[in-house]
Every structure is written in C-alpha cells, then in structure tokens.
Amino acid sequence: MNKLTFSRELRLLAPIQFKAVFEQPYRASTAELTILARQNCVNTPRLGLTVAKKHLKRAHDRNRIKRIVRESFRLKQHQLPNFDFVFVAKHGIGKLDNATLFATIDKLWTRHIRLSQQAQSKN
C-alpha cells in the first residue's frame, strides 16, 4: 500500500534546489498559477511552494493556497514522475475557490505526467 504522506524528503527546502528547477524547467501553467518541473536524482517527486505577498496580501490566503497545493501533491505523488516541482502563484489566484483551484492543479499535474512520458519516449 502506498503512503500518502508529505514528509520532509518530498519537499524542496534549500534555495539551491529551487534555483536548479528555475534554470531549465518544463512548464505547465494557467493564468493564475504555474508549476515548473525539472528531473531530479532522487527516486521521489519533490515539491517547493512560492506564493508571493505581492499576489496575496493576507497570510491566511497564502496559507490556504499552499495547503491545497500540498494536499493535491500528496494525493498525486505516486503518479508523478521523479521531478522537482515548484508551484508559483500568479496574480488572481486568490479569486479561485478551493474546488476550482484543486481541479486546476490536478489538470497541471496531469500535463506534467504527459510531458515526462513524452520526454522519456524521446530518449
């Protein structure tokens, strides 16, 4: 049975890890958010979150977005490729309700799964 936890090993913690993803990422985005990805050397997908105060002024709004993204990642982690993912919030993300945000993120995860399969088939 697969564990559906979001442990420390599944998180991007150091700035150098984020920088590696920002250098040459695969992108999947909508008007409100972007998920960047880059292949990693570990055998699990990892997630980093960036939600700028510029886009969401209140801490509870930023925390809501991060909580939904973490939950989505936690449920989808065993289907995702071994990539480092960075979630980037854009202007207007605060206007999305929880269900819409969850569905949008799920669609972007699916797009990243497809992108990784295409990249593997080229190699």
UniProtKB/Swiss-Prot annotation:
This protein's GO cellular component annotations are: ribonuclease P complex
Pfam families, alphabetized? Ribonuclease_P (PF00825)
Tell me, what is an example of a GO biological process annotation in this record?
tRNA 5'-leader removal
What is the catalytic activity of this protein?
Answer: Endonucleolytic cleavage of RNA, removing 5'-extranucleotides from tRNA precursor
Check the record and name the InterPro entries matching this protein: Ribosomal_Su5_D2-typ_SF (IPR020568), Ribsml_uS5_D2-typ_fold_subgr (IPR014721), RNase_P (IPR000100), RNase_P_CS (IPR020539)
Per UniProt, the keywords (alphabetical) are: Endonuclease, Hydrolase, Nuclease, RNA-binding, tRNA processing
Give the Gene Ontology MF terms in alphabetical order: 3'-tRNA processing endoribonuclease activity; ribonuclease P activity; tRNA binding
The domain of life is: Bacteria
What Enzyme Commission number does this protein have?
A: 3.1.26.5
Family to which the UniProt record says this protein belongs: Belongs to the RnpA family.
Subunit structure comment from the entry: Consists of a catalytic RNA component (M1 or rnpB) and a protein subunit.
Instruction: Explain the purpose of this protein.
Output: RNaseP catalyzes the removal of the 5'-leader sequence from pre-tRNA to produce the mature 5'-terminus. It can also cleave other RNA substrates such as 4.5S RNA. The protein component plays an auxiliary but essential role in vivo by binding to the 5'-leader sequence and broadening the substrate specificity of the ribozyme.
Checking PANTHER family in the record gives:
RIBONUCLEASE P PROTEIN COMPONENT
**Under which name does UniProt file this protein?**
Ribonuclease P protein component
Q: What organism is this sequence from?
A: Haemophilus ducreyi (strain 35000HP / ATCC 700724)
